[in-house]
Amino acid sequence: MKKFFKTLLVTLLLIPTCAWADNGWNDAEYQRIEQSIQLPNIKQATMKYVISAYGAKQNASAAQNQKAINKLIALVSKKGGGTVVIPKGTWRTGAIEMKSFVELNLEEGAVLQFAFEPKLYPLVRTAWEGLACWNYSPCIYAYKVSDIAITGRGTIDGGGNNDTWWQWNGNPHFGYKEGVTKEHQKMGSRARLQKMAEDGVPFDERKFGMGQGLRPQLVNFVRSERILIKDVKMINSPFWVMHPLLCKDITVDGVTVWNEGPNGDGCDPEACENVLIQNCIFHTGDDCIAIKSGRNNDGRLWNKPSKNIIIRNCRMEDGHGGVVIGSEISGGCENVYAENCEMDSPHLERILRIKTNNCRGGLIQNIHMRKVTVGQCKEAVLKINLDYEPREACYRGFEPTVRNVSMEDVTCQKSNYGVLIIGGNKVENVYDIHVKNCKFDGVIKQPTKVTGKTRNVKFDNLIINGSLVLNKEDRPYQTYSEWLTHSEMQRVPQSYLLDFSKKPKWSYVMGIEMEGMLDTYLHYKGGKSTFKGADAEANNEAIINYLKEYPAKMIDEKGNITGYKYEDFNLDNVRTAKFILRMHNLFPSKSSELALKTLFKQLQNQPRTKEGVYWHKAIYANQVWLDGIFMGLPFYCNYAVQNLKPKKAKKILDDAVDQIVKTDLRTYDEKTQLWKHAWDETHSQFWANKEDGKSQHTWARALGWYVMAMTECLDAMPEDYARRGEIITLLNKAMKSVVKYQDKKTGVWYDVMDVKDPRNYLESTASSMFAYVLLKGYRKGYLGKEYQEAGIKAYEGILNNFIKVNPDKTISLTRCCAVSGLGPGPGPYVKKPNYKRDGSFNYYMSEPIRDNDAKGVGPFIWASLEMEMQGLNK
């Protein structure tokens, strides 16, 4: 007994894994379905009866030909079966009714032309949009028959156009004219039929047809079995094209559907079993293939799911959806397999769609698609929505269930969404959805969007826009600050080789990125890390150990800095001092202390303009760059406050405020309300405006440096420092303009802010800087609530447009401008001028774009920390 319970326990523990493994494509079931589908057994199929020999004529009226063809079909069926042949030519007719054991064969060049004469379409038992009724006979109709076929290379033309059937839908786009179109859906027939069904009105009392405006299908077989439709072309259907209803054993093979009319579904098996649709071409005004099982109360009463359906080797062009389940799906649907199809059109809206609502109810399960190639679709590759027709008049509370849906080996080149799932609000009834080994490029709006109540929506090797899509529970970290920090550590195991360095490098980019990492370490120390591994605290400690490597490698015991030259007076080389200062505060050392003194000394002796603002570098004599304000002043302020007496420190702070304010006066452009990249005091540089000395354009990252400098200087300034307000006022002025230039669609910013040009691009480093300042500025009380909202929008835009998950589950910040600058032009310290860097738009566009540039990694980490500290990353 103990052994039995032990075995049972092991079995139960294995159930979730085994169940999930069985939930995808099932080859054995596929083969079982394929082998179970029966073709029609048409006795005496070789006996051919040509309609022209039995009274049909090309110059006869539609009524005359209708009578002749129907009489012949009945005769052939009565004789035990055979083939009724439509020879080459155009044959006008009214509704045709198929009988058992009859094949209707259209020879190549034959056109069966259905006339727009409503009286030729008598009332028959059918269903209209999933509701049982008496309505106009479909063009080709059958009821309770077996072993029938429509074959041949000819054409079945339903006669639909804007002057005939299509105008009945009540839409002016399809020819409807108020007061002119006599019969149409706007007369209320559709709503009346829906109410009859909801109220349980008996079928025989639901009589429509003449004068009611409910258009007939092109082909509709009801309660029939063993059906073949092969090779024909079907065009211009009044309504749905092929509509087998409550049928069994249906094969649709090699059919071409061209129907751009309203509700022009290509093939709609409804409450059918054992269906094969293969080698077909669909170009439709609605869904290409839509599997159905009755609408609302009628579907529940039929209680017959559509099941055991194979779709393969088809091409879908225009249409609302390629393969669709619903929306008339109250009876449920199960065991659908679609494979080896091609779909491509800017008007094809979805590839696989399941649509239903809580009027329907029903169980939709075991829906599988694989090996489908998509050029483009308009909305989503996979869409499941349980909110279809939210204003439908019906009795609600019948919650549908969608489960066990898989998509595998599907590629798409362009869409708005990759996966779009809209679950219900009350019941968790969308679950076990698996997208595996798929690649969707050119996704414009959002890679995946899942709303409502869902469970076990799994993405396995799903690549969207080059980024691996992970379920939240599969992410190694639940915060982006930690995730990108550890991703960089994994990519670059030695901190002194960050930013694509081949050898140890002293550079401002190192300091920016590593300071972001330091803030991540400090925020998540003490057991707060979201790392999914065994020892989260040790994982967090790895950050600080990584950061310690840099000063240990770059600064010797005498305080000498590898690669640093004092005489260059390069402000870029000072920026990393702020990181070293913070590390020194945590881990004091004599070497760091000496190095910091050297770097502060540089700032004390840095050449300046006549107005007292730092030159950017010796080779950039007499030039003020927005970049330089960030490179020098935050360390300048922090070091002074920490190491100088209050009076001397205040003098330093006053100097910093003066430089920030004077830079505003010299670089601000009233026309654009933006700040130019740089200013030349002499107005003589080749890139400078000869009248005011400004460069031509606003480079977004330069402005990002400038506003980050303001926030960091404010961090260093004591609360009672009198001139803080000047910086806060200027920060508000700058961020107001930044938000004005925020791209409304994406929430991020273009590389060159003052140019509208197709070559301009959305750029990640500046966008990260602006997001960081907006969010931090709000948290610190410098900026109002509207700026936090702009920051959230920006951060979400960065995630949607720039963050990529790599196959190894690291993340990357993409679309980073590698570098941009100005000159240098000829000067006393310049060895070789660089005339390419002329500040023109063409120049900015010529610089390379790359992933994981440290100038963006650091600000993105900071922006992420702001989201996390403010509880906005939920």
Regions found by a protein language model. Name each.
Residues 2-7, 12-13, 18-103, 107-223, ...:
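Extracellular "leader-to-stem" segments immediately downstream of a signal peptide or signal-anchor
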Residues 81, 93-95, 115-117, 136-137, ...:
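Short glycine/acidic-rich loop motifs that flank beta-strands on beta-rich extracellular proteins
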Residues 108-109, 146-154, 225-235, 248-259, ...:
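Right-handed parallel beta-helix
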Residues 162-179, 592-631:
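Asp-box/WD-like beta-propeller blade repeats and closely related beta-sheet repeat scaffolds
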Residues 329, 347-472:
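Extracellular beta-rich repeat passengers
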Residues 449, 473-484, 488-511, 520-526, ...:
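CBM-like carbohydrate-recognition segments
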Residues 479-497, 537-562, 594-613, 653-679, ...:
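Long, well-ordered core segments of solenoidal/helical folds
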Residues 707-754:
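Oxyanion-binding "anion nests"
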